[in-house]
Amino acid sequence: MELNKFDALQIGLASPEKIREWSRGEVKKPETINYRTLKPEKDGLFCERIFGPIKDWECHCGKYKRVRYKGIVCDRCGVEVTKSKVRRERMGHIELAAPVSHIWYFKGIPSRMGLILDMSPRALEKVLYFASYLVLDPKETPLLKKQLLNEKEYREAADKYGEESFEAGMGAESIKKLLQEIDLNQLSEELKENLKTSTGQKKVRIIRRLEVVESFRKSTNKPEWMIMDVIPVIPPDLRPMVQLDGGRFATSDLNDLYRRVINRNNRLKKLLDLGAPDIIVRNEKRMLQEAVDALIDNGRRGRPVTGPGNRPLKSLSDMLKGKQGRFRQNLLGKRVDYSGRSVIVVGPDLKMYQCGLPKEMALELFKPFVMKKLVETGAAHNIKSAKRMVERVQNQVWDVLEEVISDHPVMLNRAPTLHRLGIQAFQPILVEGRAIKLHPLACTAYNADFDGDQMAVHVPLSVEAQAESRFLMLAAHNILKPSDGKPVCVPTQDMVLGSYYLTIDKDGVKGEGKAFTNVDEALMAYQLGEIDIHAKIKVRLEKEIDGKMVSGIIETTIGKLIFNESIPQDLGFIDRSIAGNELLLEINFLVGKKNLGGIIDKCYRKHGPTKTSIMLDKIKAKGYHYSTISAITVSTSDMTVPPNKGELMSEAETAVEKIEKMYRRGFISDDERYERVISTWTKTTEKVADALMDNLDRFNPIFMMADSGARGSKSQIKQLAGMRGLMANPSGKIIELPIKASFREGLDVLEYFISTHGARKGNADTALKTADSGYLTRRLVDVSQDVIVRNEDCGATEGFEVSEIKEGNEVIESLSERLIGRYTSEDIIDPTSKEVLVKQNEYIDEDKAIRIEKVGVKKVKIRSVFTCNCKYGVCAKCYGMDMATAEKISMGEAVGIVAAQSIGEPGTQLTMRTFHTGGVAGSDITQGLPRVEELFEARKPKGLAIVSEVSGTVRIEETKKKRIVFIATESGEEVSYDIPFGSSLKVKNGETIGAGDEITEGSVNPHDIIRIKGVNAVKNYLLSEVQKVYRLQGVDINDKHLEVVIRQMTRKVKVEDSGDTELLPGTMIDIFDFRDENKKVEENGGRPAQARVSLLGITKAALATDSFLSAASFQETTRVLTDAAIKGKSDPLVGLKENVTIGKLIPAGTGMNRYKNIEIDPLVTETNADDENFIAEDKIEG
C-alpha cells in the first residue's frame, strides 16, 4: 500500500462476510505452543498453517527450507513457505456457535443498540445475558412486541396460549432478529414526523434515536452487524508468546482471553450436538457472551477477568487506550533510528551554530555514511570490509568521519520539549570525552543547565531533511521566541555580569581625564596598567561617513570601547542625523540584561539572524572574559545590615502593640487586627529594604549582580541583609509573626521552622504544576493542531475590533502591542487631522502602530484569525506577522501548534494558588494556571459575578437581611437580582448598565456572555482574561496565539431549527458546513436552518473534530471509535495528528502539496566553509 497515495481513511462496522474474508483460516483449538517441541499447535492460536511460518522460508515439518521454495504450500503440513513477517498481518477467525453482541454498541453511552431498538439498556442487558425472554412476534396473543417476560411469565403465557401461538426468545439471536427487521428509511420517516409534535425529554430522545438511525442509513453499515457470528483473531505477532530464561512462558493477555472464548465456544458446540437441556445451553451461551465481552473490552460490564495476582487482563480496547495504548505509544510517538543521548556540558568556545559531539557517538550515528565514504575513497574494497574497519575503529576512520560530518547538521533535543525551540539543529564538531557540548546561549531556549541534564541527538538523513535542518532549524536562525517575538538568546549570568562590568564608569580612578590619539593607544595604555577600565577618558575617533573621513574626540571609558567593538554601530540607539553625534559609541549606557535584549532585538531587525548570531558570539566571549577578570565575588562582608534596622523594628513593635490593645478593648474585630498587623510588618520590611538599598555601594558585588540582572533580585538581597519578613503557612494564609532576622544575622529556631512551611509548599506546588501545565499543553495542541496557514488571503471583509486591555487603571496590553504585525480591516484615520494613517488591508509595522497610538486612536479594526474565512486553517493576511522571524508568515506554517506551545510553555511559570482574601466567603479569586484552565475549558468560574440580562437604570434596595438590585429597562419593566451576603457591588444607585455587564465583583460565566452579548463579546472576554493572567506573571504572549485557540472553541454551531435542511435540531455542526448546507437549500428556494454559535471547552472541541483519528488518539478512545464506526466516518486527513498516525508526511511546511514536487539541487560547497556560509540565509528555491 503506497502511503502517500490515499486521501482519506474510513472506519465502519465489519460484516461477518468481511471478517471471514480477512481470515486465513479458522482457529478451532485453544492450544498455543507445544511445550516439548516449542512449535505451534495445528489449528491453535499460533497455528503456522493459518498465520504463516515461524522461521523465514521454512515450513512446519521442515520438508521445504530455503528461499527457492518461495510461495509453495507444503503438501505435508499445509504451511506456505514465505517470510515470517506475515505473522504480523495474517488474521484468523472463530466461528461462533451462537451469535453474541458487541459490547461497545450495547454498553457504550448512549447505548446505540438500545436507541435503534427503542429499548432501555437495562432491558437489553436482561435479554442478552439470558435473564428475560423478549417477545419477537406476539401473533394473535395480547402480548406486545419487545415485551420482556421473566421465566415464570413466559411459562404462564406458554401454558395459556400454547407455545406456538407467539414467538419469544432470549440472547443475542433474538436481538439480531429484531435488528434485521428494522426498515431504516421507514423508521427515519416516522421519527421525523414524531419530532414535529414532541417537546421536552421526548424530543431529546427522538433526536438521539434519529442520529443513530441516520448514521446507519447514510453509511453502508447494517444494524445487525452489531451482533457478531464470527470473531476475528488478530495476528499472532501482535499478541506474542515468548520463553523466559527459566523455561516458563510469558504471554500477552489477549491469548488468555481468546482461549476462554474458544473453550466456551467448543463446549457450546458439543452441548448443542448432544442436544443438552435448554438451561445448560443457555448458561453456556451466556458465558460465551461474557468471554467475548472480556476480549473486546474487559471490565466494561461486571467484574473484569483477572490474571495471576488479581490483575485485570488487558483487552483489545485497552490496547488502544491511554498513554501506553497503540495510538499514543506507537503511532504518535515512535523511537527512531540514528539517534543517541548523552549528558551535556558547556561549550563556551563554540560558535552559535555549533555543538560538540563525542567521537564514539558520532561514529555510531554516521556509520553508514562513513562506510560509504570509505568505499568511495578506495580505503575499503566493499561495504563489508568498510563495516569491519568501522567496527575495529581503525585510524583512517576518524579522518573520514570528520569529512562526512563537516556539512551534515544534527538535531539536538531536550525533554520536555515545551515549544519548538526544544529541538534545534547544529553543525557537529567532534570532541573527546563522552559528553555533548552545548553552546551557552542555546540554554535558555532548551531551559537546560549543566547539573546533569541529558540531551538527545538525531541525524537528518535525506538531502531534504538536511536542507530543512540547516535553513529552518539552525540555532543561529532561531533567535526570536515564537510566542512574543522577543529574542530568546539573551546572554545570562556571567555574560551579563561581564557586559555590565565593561560598561560601568567610576569616578576618581587611575587615568581619569587622560586623552588618547586613537583607540589602539588607549587599549595599550590599559594593558600596560596606566589607566583603569572604568576611567572616564577622551579618545579621538575617525570614521568614514558618505565617503568623507570625519574625526573628533569623544568622552568614554575603555570598557565601553571594548564592548562596542562587537556591536554594529547603526542600531539606532543614537540619532546619527544630529550634528556631533556621528562618532558617538552606539552603546553609551550601562548594559544590564534588559538592555542586552534590546540590543539583540534591534540588531535582528536591522541586520537579520546571521549578523546577530555573530554579534552574540562576540558578546559571549567578552562577557565571560571580563566577568572573570573583574573577580566579582560574594562574601559575608558585602552584606551590611542597615544601621537603623533596630530603630525601625522597635517602631513596628510599638505599632503592633497598639493594634493589639485596640483589639483587646474591643475597638476592632479580629479580622481587622490581623489585616493591620500584616500591613504594619509589610511596610516595615519595605522600609528596612529601602534603608539597605540606600546603604549599598554601586560597586558592591551583590548589588552589581542583582542590578545587572545576572543573578538574584532585590527581594533576595533584602532577605540576605535586611529582614526576611512575613511568611505564609501551608494553606497560603500569612503568619502574623514576621521573621525579623536576615540570613546574615542568622535565624533562630522558631523563625527557621516558620520559613520551612513556605519552602515545602513551593516544592510541592512546582511538582503538581508541571503535570497540570503539561496536560493543558496537550489539550491545547489537540484542539488547534490542524490550524495551518493554507491560503494567502481569504478575502474576509469583517474585522475584529481591538483596544488596549486594562485591569482597573493599569494598562495590561497597550494598543500598539496589539497592532504590530497585523493587517488593517478598514482605513485608520487620524481623529484630529482626518488623514488616512493606514489604508485598508495594509500591514502595520512597529512605527505605524506607535504612530496610531500617539495620535489618540482608541479602537482599531484589524484582520484577525477570529474572522478568517478559511474552512481549514487560516490565511496569511488574517494571521499577520510570524513572531519567530518578524516577517510575514509563510505558507504551510503550523500556527496552531505554535499557538498551543506558546500558551502552554509558560504554564509552569504561572502560580497554582487561589488567593484567600482574609477569609471572606465567596470572594476567592482563582488565578494563575487554574484560571487559565477554567477559561479555556469554558467552565462556570469560581466566585461567579451576577450579570445583568438587560440594559437599564439601577436601583438598589437594602433590607435588613439582603440587598436587591432592580434594573428598569426602557420599556418600563423591572428585573430584580438578589445579592448574596458578602459580595461587593460593582454598580451604584441611578447608574445605567448594559446587558451582560456585571452587577457584583467576580468572574463572569462565559456562557452567559455568549448568550446575552453574542460571540464577539465572548471571544474578546476570553482573550483579555487569559492575557491578564499571563501579564500579571510577567509573561508576554502575542494575541494571535490565543485567537487561534479561541477560534477553535467557537467553530461549532448548535442547530435550533432545521428548516428544509437535512440537519437535526440540537446537533453540533461546524460553522462552515452549516453555511454550505444553508447555501444549498437557499439556492433551491428552501428555508435555511437556524443555529447559534456554541462555546466549547478545549477538551470538548478537540473531541468534536472532524477527524476521528485525532479525537481517538486524544481521549475517550473507545467512545470516539464506537461513534465513528457507526457513522461510517471518513477521516479527510487534513490535520497533523492524523497524518502522523498513519505515517504520511504532515500537510504543513514542506509537506504541503504545493511544495511536494520541489527538486533540490545539491550545492557543491567548499568544505570547512566560513561561519557565514554555514548559516547563510539561502532559502529553498521553489
From Swiss-Prot:
GO terms of biological process kind: DNA-templated transcription
Reaction equations catalysed: RNA(n) + a ribonucleoside 5'-triphosphate = RNA(n+1) + diphosphate
UniProt keywords, alphabetically: DNA-directed RNA polymerase, Magnesium, Metal-binding, Nucleotidyltransferase, Transcription, Transferase, Zinc
EC number of this enzyme: 2.7.7.6
One GO term describing the cellular component: DNA-directed RNA polymerase complex
Xref: InterPro entries: DNA-dir_RpoC_beta_prime, DNA-dir_RpoC_beta_prime_bact, RNA_pol_asu, RNA_pol_N, RNA_pol_Rpb1_1, RNA_pol_Rpb1_3, RNA_pol_Rpb1_3_sf, RNA_pol_Rpb1_4
Family, similarity comment: Belongs to the RNA polymerase beta' chain family.
Subunit organization: The RNAP catalytic core consists of 2 alpha, 1 beta, 1 beta' and 1 omega subunit. When a sigma factor is associated with the core the holoenzyme is formed, which can initiate transcription.
Record-given protein name: DNA-directed RNA polymerase subunit beta'
Natural source organism: Clostridium acetobutylicum (strain ATCC 824 / DSM 792 / JCM 1419 / IAM 19013 / LMG 5710 / NBRC 13948 / NRRL B-527 / VKM B-1787 / 2291 / W)
